[in-house]
Swiss-Prot record:
Xref: HAMAP family: EF_G_EF_2_B
Domain tr-type G positions: 12-286
Binding site for GTP: 21-28, 85-89, 139-142
Function per UniProt: Catalyzes the GTP-dependent ribosomal translocation step during translation elongation. During this step, the ribosome changes from the pre-translocational (PRE) to the post-translocational (POST) state as the newly formed A-site-bound peptidyl-tRNA and P-site-bound deacylated tRNA move to the P and E sites, respectively. Catalyzes the coordinated movement of the two tRNA molecules, the mRNA and conformational changes in the ribosome.
GO MF term (any one): GTP binding
Entry protein name: Elongation factor G
Gene3D superfamilies: 3.30.230.10, 3.30.70.240, Elongation Factor G (Translational Gtpase), domain 3 (3.30.70.870), P-loop containing nucleotide triphosphate hydrolases (3.40.50.300), Translation factors (2.40.30.10)
BP-aspect Gene Ontology terms: ribosome disassembly
Predominant cellular place of this UniProt entry's protein: cytoplasm
Subcellular location: Cytoplasm
CDD domains tied to this protein: EF-G (cd01886), EFG_III (cd16262), EFG_mtEFG1_IV (cd01434), EFG_mtEFG_C (cd03713), EFG_mtEFG_II (cd04088)
GO CC annotation, single: cytoplasm
Amino acid sequence: MQSVEARYVDLDKIRNIGIMAHIDAGKTTTTERILYYTGRKHFIGDVDEGTATTDWMPQEKERGITIQSAATTCFWKGYRINIIDTPGHVDFTAEVERALRVLDGAIAVFDATAGVEPQSETVWRQADKYNVPRIAFMNKMDKVGADFYMAVETLVTKLRANPIPIQMPIGSEKDFQGVIDLIKMKAIYWTSEDGSVYEEREIPDELKEEAELRREEMLEKVAELDETILEKYLEGEEITEEEIKKVLRKATIENRAVPVLCGAAKMNKGIQPLLDAVIDYLPSPLDLPPVKGWRLSDGEVVYRKPDENEPFTALVFKVQVDPYIGKLVYFRVYSGRLEKGSYVYNSTKGQRERISRIVFMHADKREEVDYVRPGDIAAGVGLKASQTGDTLCDEKEPTVLEKIDFPEPVISLAIEPATKSDEEKLVKALLALSEEDPTLQVKVDKETGETIISGMGELHLEIIVDRLKREFGVNVRVGQPQVAYRETIKKAAEAEGKYIRQTGGRGQYGHVILRIEPIPEEEGKNFEFIDKTVGGVIPKEFMPAIEAGIKEAMMSGPLAGYPVVRIRAIVLDGSYHEVDSSEMAFKIAASLAFKEAMKKAQPVLLEPIMKLEITTPEEYMGNIIADLNSRRAKVEALETRGHLKVIVAKVPLSETFGYATTLRSLSQGRASYIMQFSHYQEVPEKIAEKIIKVV
């Protein structure tokens, strides 16, 4: 294998891409084939056999789903492609978010029998949020029910995308043989068992007419993207291959079009043209606008261009604890150059760190390199303080990039070590896991002393418990899953908080008059603090203490001790004492005022509501809907996808525990579901009473 040193390539020859898809669309298989044909692998891994390169954690090998996005480097026709494999399961949305943040483009893989499935919509929206250019690959063309044009149509109806098929399939289902390239107007057939040998031939006579028609449709859509081409098209002039590619590339990078290809990754068909499309249509780091950051010294906006001579800037998008090498920090370089052994400044933490080794990752193997440059995706060793979302930069020019936002956890689980010897190991293991996964929260319940882990769903926490056993050798006992309830208020209220202590020597004096108001859910804020005092009744230096007192009180609401959310706190008035006032006194006074105001403001309990999408054969629909109704669910839509029915419902999280087992028995194992957090909503009074009683 050529050394990586020899294979540093120019920036315009780098592609940083992700492969995104619904859980079973064949994304990992597609990645495997890409690695095989680009020469990084000597045998083809198969997810069903558990030998896939990117699925390298034991849990993934067993479950056949991708959990941790692995970064892999490969080469194709002189271009370097860095691939970040992203999970398609909703409990791992955070992994997808952070991968998309550092990518330049993506391949969206779809199952040609289903087209856009629920999870593909979620991932697509996340990619929209970060303006990631995409090409689409309709996979599984050999599967019964495969329908290329139906699948393409779902991109329009479900995702409002502008798909432009640049290929058409030759046959489908068991007769799928290859593809017709509508730009070159050639047929491509794969002639060897492993798919590494393929050849271009003339289009068979019986397909010529359809191919002409499909090419015409493609040209029409391409012409809509560019004035010059439109004129040529209307004049009936010849449009060259180069012109089509140039216009498509520009439109893809600007997110105005999605080139669509097809194939059957498992049957080794369609991968090489897909790699060509990555090079032809997805951006290099040079095609994208400079990255935006803020200068630490004065908060001014600065832009960093992908240039080795600019100050070094990189974003940490993942942390992994490797059993042999220790902490691996994955980062994307936006500007400048970093040598191994040199110092780097973590501007998020305000700490200087030394990067002792730099490695390029190939799923679970590593290749050491001496330096990194713009566009590189690498992992560093020795960065002890760095966490996901941190900015690494040049100490002389400290800047900070925008952080990655992660959703709050909605489900908790109490865990305890099975034996005394597991106790110390558990603390270390949880620390390591929460470093890797920003959506995993770990806390110790002050009253019971129990360790509570919180995450994004039942599967998320199951896998955490599983990893504790396997990777860290910690055996734990697990409690029942608990819902992360919240408390809020329905009306505004005012209250006074006074904290006065006169003992010998210096006293304590804090006095606050506070108004609290509900923040509407659509504002998306959990807390806002406003100082409306006038005339210096409370000196400004005590305001941070007042805010801290309120925030502390919000950690435990009056109804059942759950955290309080969606509150606007306004300090109206108060008073202070020249000698006796202190931060402590105002913190306590604010906390007292808040607790008093909460009682008057009609506090209510909120519960997480999940969006549930169930795909089932029609005959089980009645039973499934009846069961949903018994779980306080609201059915929002019924759709038909091929020969299956899809039920979309909103259901309280508390009613979903163990749902996988129920659904299996209701449908004889033939229905599947995905569930993700939707929003918080007020708990009905009768149910709220029960929850409050238990507490």
